[in-house]
């Protein structure tokens, strides 16, 4: 079975703290953040539960490489990515469905 990968950026309600991550199951991972599954996590500590940016990859490993690349960059670069895709910093998790893959690629194209 083919496994897609996703790089994502989340923030808090005030858009002051940014969190970058990568996963093979974006819907599930975002729900874990929103439901505060990991009790000692950065996202819980800073109340990060709003998905503001994501990229989809046809190869999962590419998403994890992208995460490393973006994490190494400046906050300004992260904000530029977000603003280009999502200028109003809306919570994109509202658009996600449990069926990923091609659906998420289609959603991402809507924001270009």
Task: Locate each region found by the language model.
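GIY-YIG nuclease catalytic motif and its immediate N-terminal context
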Residues: 1-38, 44-54, 65-68, 85-87, ...
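Residues at or immediately preceding the N-termini of alpha-helices
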Residues: 26, 59-61, 75
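Short arginine-rich
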Residues: 68-82
């Amino acid at each position: 079975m083919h496994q897609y990968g996703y790089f994502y950026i989340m923030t808090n309600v005030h858009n002051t703290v940014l969190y970058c991550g990568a996963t093979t199951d974006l819907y599930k991972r975002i729900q874990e953040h929103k439901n505060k599954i990991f009790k000692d996590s950065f996202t819980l500590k800073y109340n990060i539960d709003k998905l503001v940016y994501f990229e989809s990859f046809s190869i999962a490993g590419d998403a994890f490489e992208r995460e490393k690349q973006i994490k190494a960059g400046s906050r300004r670069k992260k904000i530029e990515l977000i603003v280009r895709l999502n200028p109003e910093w809306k919570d994109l998790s509202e658009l996600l469905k449990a069926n990923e893959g091609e659906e998420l690629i289609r959603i991402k194209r809507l924001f270009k």
